[in-house]
Amino acid sequence: VLACNDSFRAAAPGLEETDCIPVWMFSAAPQAVHVRWPHESAYSVATLKAVLGRYRDSEQAHDVMRQLRPIKEFRRQWFSSIEVSYGRDTSDLLHVRDPATGEPASYRLSVADINQTQNVLLLTAIRKPYSGPPI
């Protein structure tokens, strides 16, 4: 995470400790925030596989894997699936609970390249009325 607004930081408690969404996803906070944590963590692993395919020799890739490798649930998901994701369907809404109020919300996510090298991506989250599974 290079930059984000206050709303994103509030919705992702603890992210500032890692500034890395895949590492954050396997910490305690996201499991309380994400209504469908198993779905979101699997998506995170599939996306990480795609990114590591391109940047596997970078120091950042090695650092992320050093942090994730000791986590049993990450290893289970990594080795139990061949899923690779290069994007997120906009109909696949993110369902979360507000960390402060517990109020559920759904978000439509879109990811866009902001430069021609595809080294920096812009994530936009549009809040929608909650439409996830019953809580």
Features from the language model and the residues they span:
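C-terminal regulatory/effector modules of DNA-binding transcriptional regulators
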Residues: 50-135
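PAS-family sensory domains
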Residues: 1-87
